[in-house]
């Protein structure tokens, strides 16, 4: 570009009336480029985006980078600084990671934080718009103190976005990059929370005026052993043993959820199950995968749209159906998929279900050769189209996403924070890996979900740790087989450990924050401030006993003050001036007042 012109103005948007600095670039045979910078009054961040305008012809691009820093200034204190890897979705047991700046190249999805753990000062870069683009932040390391370069761009498509072809191109007289936030914060954790809040301003979380769901899901143990009689027995077990003994949410409600396998029930059995739940003071839940074909039989006719075969609805890449997790991806914009949504939602509504777990959502966000709707140009556009339809048909139910991208987030009340988790300390550690660096996601959804808590075939310490991982994450969902033929151990452990009143009171749906950001796998210390009460959690993911001193100053407390502390699993009073001991594969959950 040969010419540039800067102007200032004010605009009104979700952030209020804010200043905008526009820089317009022109050049021979080039589309006009206009970059906007929005400094947000009272905040430690600015927003930026740019448009390409074709004067006489359409413009087309599948990569637009509003932030491109080729020589990164030293923004942080010198020291062993870190950069976060945030995954695009939660499939295939993907893990978050805090990296020392010793990598050649690191790509994070939608957002990253780069920070000094000791001072906690850090900067956050990420997309706050998720209508058209999958966004990535690509970083190159200079040395352990600083990055060499950073580029934040719309147009990410690779193995970790589950794509097998390049990102779709936006095409039109005018095309726009994602809107990106760049902020410098005294505490990187606050920075990620403010990033989430900015997202929620633009796309508010799906409304919910009831308490966080607490209950049961059949996939924990029963899986495809789920039957109608067993489902009734589970509902009765909760009524008789748990929900009258502190295992319920603050609405005194328990959710009993049928997962995959419910389709072996007749409609009459489904209705009778829902009615049993209602009689037991419970809400019935169910399960569906809207964007998948598990049969993978291209010539089969769609049951709910018999004028179409499955080959008509696949999302093709390079002429082939796209397979992920054993299922083919289907086109969220195809009328046959809408017909399936309509018929399935009508069935759920006739039966009386009020909660639905939606799974394998990333299939609907894949890049493709084309979509049925010709206006769709990118995978995320297709996903938004499909999710809006999902809300049209299921919007009066509670929607909990399971395997899914983090963004867009406005179509469901909650989302599972990681992949599947069961009963062992490794399941707790894996769940807490996502909470370590993704706790803030409960600001773009109503709640995070730590998956089903299974208690059988694990030590009692592992039980305490796994339950703690749920109550400090969000949704509180048990998973053992509580039918009459189910494990005696699972029932005894549930009656013992799912009924601790002090522990269960913590489960208000607000995720705990990490205290540090340097875990090689997961952080093991977390906290939440509730008015004048501070909760401190320390996990021991290892086999051997460990001792820790509660880091009072790091969690914002004055060691000189008189503090009362109680460990909630044992009920024991804790002397905060002394080290506390955590047995192997266990947890301490401490309330400090």
What are the roles of these predicted feature ranges?
Residues 69-82, 553-569:
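Solvent-exposed beta-hairpin/edge-strand motifs
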Residues 301-339, 381, 385-488:
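Glycan-recognition surfaces
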Residues 50, 172, 216, 399, ...:
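Conserved, mostly hydrophobic/aromatic
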Residues 46, 470-473, 478, 516-558, ...:
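Carbohydrate-binding surface patches
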Residues 467-517:
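Aromatic- and carboxylate-lined catalytic core of secreted/periplasmic carbohydrate-active enzymes
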Residues 1-250, 280:
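Carbohydrate-recognition beta-sandwich/jelly-roll modules
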Residues 211-368, 379-382, 389-393, 399:
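Substrate-binding cleft of carbohydrate-active enzyme catalytic domains
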């Amino acid at each position: 570009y040969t010419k540039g012109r800067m102007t200032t103005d004010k605009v009104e948007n979700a952030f209020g009336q804010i200043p905008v600095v526009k820089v317009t670039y022109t050049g021979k045979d080039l589309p006009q480029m206009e970059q906007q910078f929005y400094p947000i009054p009272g905040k430690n961040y600015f927003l930026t985006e740019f448009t390409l305008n074709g004067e006489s012809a359409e413009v087309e691009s599948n990569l637009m980078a509003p932030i491109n820093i080729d020589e990164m200034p030293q923004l942080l204190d010198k020291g062993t600084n870190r950069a976060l890897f945030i995954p695009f979705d939660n499939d295939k047991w993907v893990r978050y990671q805090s990296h020392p700046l010793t990598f050649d190249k690191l790509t994070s999805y939608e957002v990253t934080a780069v920070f000094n753990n000791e001072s906690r000062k850090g900067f956050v870069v990420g997309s706050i718009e998720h209508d058209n683009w999958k966004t990535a932040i690509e970083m190159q390391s200079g040395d352990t103190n600083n990055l060499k370069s950073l580029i934040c761009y719309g147009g990410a498509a690779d193995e970790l976005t589950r794509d097998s072809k390049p990102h779709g191109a936006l095409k039109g007289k005018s095309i726009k990059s994602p809107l990106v936030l760049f902020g410098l914060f005294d505490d990187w954790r606050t920075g990620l929370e403010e990033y989430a809040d900015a997202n929620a301003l633009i796309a508010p979380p799906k409304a919910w005026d009831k308490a966080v769901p607490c209950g049961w899901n059949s996939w924990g143990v029963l899986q495809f052993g789920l039957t109608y009689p067993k489902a009734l027995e589970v509902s009765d077990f909760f009524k008789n043993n748990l929900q009258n003994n502190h295992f319920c949410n603050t609405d005194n409600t328990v959710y009993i959820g049928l997962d995959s396998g419910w389709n072996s029930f007749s409609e009459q059995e489904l209705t009778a199950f829902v009615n049993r739940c209602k009689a037991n003071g419970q809400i019935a839940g169910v399960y569906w995968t809207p964007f998948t074909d598990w049969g993978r039989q291209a010539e089969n006719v769609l049951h709910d749209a018999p004028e179409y075969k499955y080959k008509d609805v696949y999302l093709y890449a390079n002429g082939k159906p796209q397979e992920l997790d054993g299922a083919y991806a289907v086109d969220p914009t195809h009328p046959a998929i809408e017909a399936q949504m309509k018929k399935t939602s009508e069935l759920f509504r006739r039966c009386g279900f009020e909660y639905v777990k939606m799974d394998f959502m990333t299939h609907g966000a894949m890049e493709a050769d084309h979509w049925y709707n010709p206006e769709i140009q990118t995978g995320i556009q297709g996903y938004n189209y499909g999710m809006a339809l999902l809300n049209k048909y299921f919007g009066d139910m509670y929607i909990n996403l399971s395997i899914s991208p983090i963004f867009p987030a406005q179509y469901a009340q909650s989302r599972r924070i990681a992949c599947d988790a069961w009963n062992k300390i490794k399941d707790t550690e894996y769940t807490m890996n996502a909470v370590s660096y993704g706790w803030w996601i409960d600001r773009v959804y109503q709640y995070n979900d730590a998956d089903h808590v299974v208690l059988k075939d694990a030590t009692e310490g592992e039980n305490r740790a796994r339950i703690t991982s749920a109550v400090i994450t969000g949704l509180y969902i048990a998973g053992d087989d509580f039918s009459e033929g189910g494990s005696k151990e699972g029932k005894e452990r549930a009656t013992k450990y799912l009924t601790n009143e002090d522990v269960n009171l913590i489960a208000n749906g607000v995720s705990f924050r990490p205290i540090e950001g340097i875990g090689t796998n997961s952080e093991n210390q977390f906290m939440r401030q509730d008015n004048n009460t501070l909760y401190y959690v320390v996990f021991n993911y290892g086999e051997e006993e460990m001792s820790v001193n509660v880091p009072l100053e790091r969690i914002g407390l004055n060691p000189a003050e008189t503090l009362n502390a109680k460990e909630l699993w044992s009920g024991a009073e804790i002397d905060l001036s002394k080290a506390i001991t955590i047995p192997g594969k266990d947890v301490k959950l401490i309330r400090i007042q």
